[in-house]
Amino acid sequence: MKACSDDFIIAHTPEEAVDRLAALHQEATGALSHALKRYLKERIRPDASEHCLFRYPELRLTYLCQGEVPTTVRAYAKVQVPGTYAITVTQPAAFRKYLLEQLRPLMNDFTLRVEVGRSQQNIPYPYVVEGGDELAGSGVTAAELARVFPSTDLSAATDGTADGLYDWENIDPLPLALFDAARTDFSLKRIQHYTGSDWRHVQPWILLTNYHRYVDQFIRHGLDMLVGDSRFTRMVLPGNVVIERGMAEGEMQAIIENVVWHRYQMPAYHLQANDGHGITLVNIGVGPSNAKNITDHLAVLRPHCWLMIGHCGGLRQSQTIGDYVLAHAYMRRDGILDRVLPPHIPLPALAEVQQALQEAAKLVTGEEGDELKKRLRTGTVLTYDDRNWELRWAQERPLINLSRAVAVDMESGTIAAQGYRLRVPYGTLLCVSDKPLHSEIKLPGAAGAFYERAVTQHLHIGIAALELMRSQLNSLHSRKLRSFDEPPFR
């Protein structure tokens, strides 16, 4: 069989590189989609020359001039050692802004040879099937298609770079980014499955919550933004249902009432702006498994920040239901990431995020100084994987006491650990909904009054914090999240 040509061509500008990536990806997915439809209809197998087209494009950077130092202290777009860096790329047209943000400073500050061509990594056929209707009624099984077309290879979709599993002294080429095309495509499909949204709707500023009532408040906030004078232009609901600025309020309400969000495990809601800096809220439900699951997938979109805003149990006598907890440390008892990020590894508090949350609380509540301190407690959050941890209180008490924890939940430590691990700025602001150690538990009557008083304000603090960070984007991406062996791309 004749070997496939890789056709690598030097790109002289970032725009030229991304344009060629997009052209090669469109050619590859178009050829694969055409061959797949032809096989479903006529049972004609693709020949060897067609198979050569079913490959992801690859971006390569070769750096030979050791010792060049960038003019800024940014946390990304750096090459640390001479050599060739490479990554396969999927959906380059959709990721164009991100790719240019990485390539422009790299090509400006370093002497590089940038090349684009076809990789040796095949595109699995499921990643060109948009809705699944193409396979319905064809009489062809998935097993048969896997024998004819490239199929998903889970050994290729790994987090080896993010988890530092590669020996950088003996790998060639070096990784250019944390996630290659196969890993990215894997997550793009999962985002759609879990959230009920096309991944293209997800915004770079993300709120994660563990209570549906935050969703109700986010939708109300979104409607206010679309009706009033704001930078937001549309809101996308689960099932890719769109509400546009300019619609009548009655029409908006009718659309909302008919959204079938309960079909999706972790429904997502997207408040979008023309500049691409909108806000996404994901109701992740309860538990560290969900928290890890969704952040594994959202990370491939390279968001600017994710914040956990949800409820927690207050552990201190001085706390009152409705108070806030700003996490500055985490004691991880969730167990889910222990193999890749042992619990003794500290998760640094990111100053840019902490300051934004503190300032947002001040702006939204109108309180400051000692008055704000009465409502906003800073301290360690304990994250469990066992909702009934109280039944082991005698065994858990000594460790909780040593940790000086002020709150307990089931998601925050996992989300922060994922942010640290996957290099996404992270933060946590929780609201005390009960005090399990002081006989103040959630009761139906009290819960309604608590939600009415606290949830709206809490959500607005999270949104205000994201807006503050958006205005200071250049300083947000922290060097605290970079390892010694770090790919050039953010």
What does each model-identified segment do?
Residues 1-305, 313-490:
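Accessory terminal and edge-of-domain segments that mediate assembly/interaction
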